[in-house]
Amino acid sequence: MKTLLLTLVVVTMVCLDLAYTRRCYNQQSSQPKTTKSCPPGENSCYNKQWRDHRGSITERGCGCPKVKPGIKLRCCESEDCNN
């Protein structure tokens, strides 16, 4: 009985870990903070900053995109790390 219970606990832990998704901030510039659960397998968050005629623009989200020259990009791999 103890072996069965231990097996169920281990299986539950493994299944819960497989369903884990990264959470990142996704608000733009100075808008109120919001978060998003990333798609399965997406383990990083990004914070992208640039300047244009409106001033400093910030974009946040899941992943680590490629950017053009002149755009500052910071990628990270912990919960809510891209603020």
UniProtKB/Swiss-Prot annotation:
Keywords: Acetylcholine receptor inhibiting toxin, Disulfide bond, Ion channel impairing toxin, Neurotoxin, Postsynaptic neurotoxin, Secreted, Signal, Toxin. Residues 1-21 form the signal peptide. One of its GO terms (molecular function) is toxin activity. Its main location: secreted. InterPro entries: Snake_3FTx, Snake_toxin-like_sf, Snake_toxin_con_site, Toxin_cobra-type. Transmembrane segments: none annotated. Belongs to the three-finger toxin family. Short-chain subfamily. Type I alpha-neurotoxin sub-subfamily. The keyword Disulfide bond applies. One of its GO terms (cellular component) is extracellular region. It is found in: Secreted. Expressed by the venom gland. It comes from the Eukaryota. The keyword Cytoplasm does not apply. SUPFAM superfamilies: Snake toxin-like. Disulfide bonds join 24-45, 38-62, 64-75, 76-81. Binds to muscle nicotinic acetylcholine receptor (nAChR) and inhibit acetylcholine from binding to the receptor, thereby impairing neuromuscular transmission. It holds the Pfam family Toxin_cobra-type. This is Short neurotoxin C.
